């Protein structure tokens, strides 16, 4: 029984350490994180809908899911580039990173619209 309570306490300490470290994250990165969570949640919601209703217009389903996943991946790339603590992108300004994000999203959605037919 002591081992279980020790494991629970370790898990709680770990969660508290992660939460306190994330609390120090700048607000703009938290907004990007929220956007990523929303995109992934939307993709999961589309998966559940397809499982319940059926995949009749399968290219539409694939377009929707790939749009959500692609947007989430591009947002993660934006988060990496905008993060001040990241040493690899020190000389890349946030405006340039956002412009890259917008341009890549435009290309992604043009490809997805082409895939729809």
Curated annotation (Swiss-Prot):
Q: Which GO terms describe its cellular component?
A: oligosaccharyltransferase complex
Biological process (GO) annotations held by this record are:
protein N-linked glycosylation
* Transmembrane helix among keywords: yes
Q: In which pathway does it act?
A: Protein modification; protein glycosylation
The residues exposed to the Cytoplasmic compartment are 1-33, 79-96
Where does this polypeptide localize? Endoplasmic reticulum membrane
Keyword Membrane carried by entry: yes
Q: Topological domain, Lumenal: which ranges?
A: 55-57
Tell me which Pfam families the record gives: DAD (PF02109)
Its keywords, alphabetically, are: Apoptosis, Endoplasmic reticulum, Membrane, Transmembrane, Transmembrane helix
Q: Which residues cross the membrane?
A: 34-54, 58-78, 97-117
InterPro entries tied to this protein: DAD/Ost2
The protein's topology relative to the membrane is:
Multi-pass membrane protein
| Primary localization | endoplasmic reticulum
Q: What does this protein do?
A: Subunit of the oligosaccharyl transferase (OST) complex that catalyzes the initial transfer of a defined glycan (Glc(3)Man(9)GlcNAc(2) in eukaryotes) from the lipid carrier dolichol-pyrophosphate to an asparagine residue within an Asn-X-Ser/Thr consensus motif in nascent polypeptide chains, the first step in protein N-glycosylation. N-glycosylation occurs cotranslationally and the complex associates with the Sec61 complex at the channel-forming translocon complex that mediates protein translocation across the endoplasmic reticulum (ER). All subunits are required for a maximal enzyme activity.
**Assigned protein family:** Belongs to the DAD/OST2 family.
Subunit structure of this chain's protein: Component of the oligosaccharyltransferase (OST) complex.
Designated name of the protein: Dolichyl-diphosphooligosaccharide--protein glycosyltransferase subunit DAD1
